[in-house]
Amino acid sequence: MARYTGPSWKVSRRLGISLSGTGKELERRPYAPGQHGPTQRKKISEYGLQQAEKQKLRHMYGLTERQFKNTFNKAGKLRGKHGENFMILLEQRLDNIVYRLGLARTRRAARQLVNHGHITVDGKRVDIPSYQVSVGQVISVREKSAKNSAIAESLEVSSFVPEYVTFDAEKLTGSLNRLPERSELAAEINEAFIVEFYSR
């Protein structure tokens, strides 16, 4: 399944979450596209709930189904809870860390920064959004990209940086100082549904 590249607000309304992180998509019309008003939806089956939860998380991080499933399988080989490990692995993606540092306003924009070669890891350019960032690695904006307008605009509006990352706005560098705890990740996601979905 290819990555969705259409309007994110449509997916946000269908899934009931804000993919942009601003919540603006749901302010005016907090119901699915195609509905003529906030009417009650049909009762969803258990399978439907599980699938919807999977779609929420997949679209949140902007992954294809194949990327999502591969990461899920990788998480299953680690010690601990499968669902939590899965969410932590998603959080360790380079494009997500760039987003968490405030260098991009959305994960989609962060993925473009990485793809276009604006980001380095430990001083070496990395243009693979799925690159897994390890604790202690230094993420920086390339010197040639320091005046990138998209980065500057994002830094002007970004204020919240999670405790598990550190960021130096003057040097445009940051790092993953520890793995996040489950309580620090998306509270609106029930990862148990996703584990159940793939366990069928």
Swiss-Prot record:
Alphabetical list of InterPro entries matching this protein: Ribosomal_uS4, Ribosomal_uS4_bac-type, Ribosomal_uS4_CS, Ribosomal_uS4_N, S4_RNA-bd, S4_RNA-bd_sf
GO cellular component: small ribosomal subunit
Alphabetical UniProt keywords: Ribonucleoprotein, Ribosomal protein, RNA-binding, rRNA-binding
Pfam families per the UniProt record, alphabetical: Ribosomal_S4, S4
GO biological process terms held by the UniProt record: ribosomal small subunit biogenesis; translation
Domain annotation S4 RNA-binding: ranges: 92-170
SUPFAM superfamilies: Alpha-L RNA-binding motif (SSF55174)
Region Disordered: start-end pairs: 22-43
SMART domains cross-referenced by the UniProt entry: Ribosomal_S4 (SM01390), S4 (SM00363)
PANTHER family per the UniProt record, alphabetical: 30S 40S RIBOSOMAL PROTEIN (PTHR11831), SMALL RIBOSOMAL SUBUNIT PROTEIN US4M (PTHR11831:SF4)
Family stated for the protein in its record: Belongs to the universal ribosomal protein uS4 family.
HAMAP family reported in the protein's UniProt record: Ribosomal_uS4_B
Function: One of the primary rRNA binding proteins, it binds directly to 16S rRNA where it nucleates assembly of the body of the 30S subunit.
Subunit composition and interactions: Part of the 30S ribosomal subunit. Contacts protein S5. The interaction surface between S4 and S5 is involved in control of translational fidelity.
Identification of the protein by name: Small ribosomal subunit protein uS4
Gene name in the database record: rpsD
